[in-house]
């Protein structure tokens, strides 16, 4: 970090992201998941560096991925910590941003007494946060229910638990015997850039047909 810090402010942003290991590593270089103590050390070092960069250049420059805080068992920083959210694509600040945007959107809603019950498939890592956010909406929408399913990633295996790498067959296998109520919502981040297929070449239609339900693909702003 300090070597890169010499090039600030030309070096504008650095993301510290734990290695993601699939279950298919035969013959590859031996890597392992970080231990909680190691993740905590990484966060401490990044924060010390960030405070100095903030003093010198007005920006922390280095930010740890949300996953590092989860591994370390430490609370995530709040919204203001992440400045311009330059590293969202690397999983840095996504939790703080989602909490802020959800609270903002909820504050502008009047609420209603309509009844509905849908299901939502997501990665295992995101499921607890989504359930937490939904609890905050109950006062305004007491009769609207959304059951969140954190889908284990069988395709990639290992420690892969992010939503964007969940495949169609993972969803089908995990939800085959579970209640889906009025339909299943899928985040579009699960789909390739063309928004028509999962990484395993299955489609939302395949999921709908296999699970005998209606599938709704929700955009990043939905």
List where the protein language model places each region.
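Radical SAM enzyme core and accessory elements
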Residues: 72-222
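Conserved strand-turn element in the central/C-terminal portion of the radical SAM core barrel
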Residues: 1, 13-35, 119-124, 149-161
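Conserved C-terminal portion of the radical SAM core fold
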Residues: 1-27, 37-67
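Short secondary-structure boundary/capping segments
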Residues: 1, 29-38, 77-80, 200-202
